[in-house]
Amino acid sequence: IDDFKKKMIRGELKNGDRIPSQREYAEMAQVNPNTVQRAYREMEAMHMVETLRGQGTFVSIDQEMLARMKEEMAQSILNYFISEMNALGYQPSDLIRMLEEYMQAKEAEDQ
């Protein structure tokens, strides 16, 4: 599901786009088809996709939900990052300094 969320957030999958069939995706991801079936059902319950009998499964997500998913994913990544950095002994002020240095280096790189 996270793979589909990321693709939707990045704009790689848009409303109306057909996603692979459950069987196709199971083969591509090399996972059990039952796992994919459960994931597709969950995405339908979350109103991320819609399955049209005989036609396939299509992205059907509104912009508000997309923004909410993006924020939740960013928060999850940030929580993981902070937790790992704290485990390494870094303080919040260290993280801010490191992030500022990183962003300055990226800006200089882009110029």
Please report, for each region that a protein language model flagged, where it lies by residue:
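Beta-hairpin "wing" of winged helix-turn-helix
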Residues: 12-13, 17, 45-54, 58-61
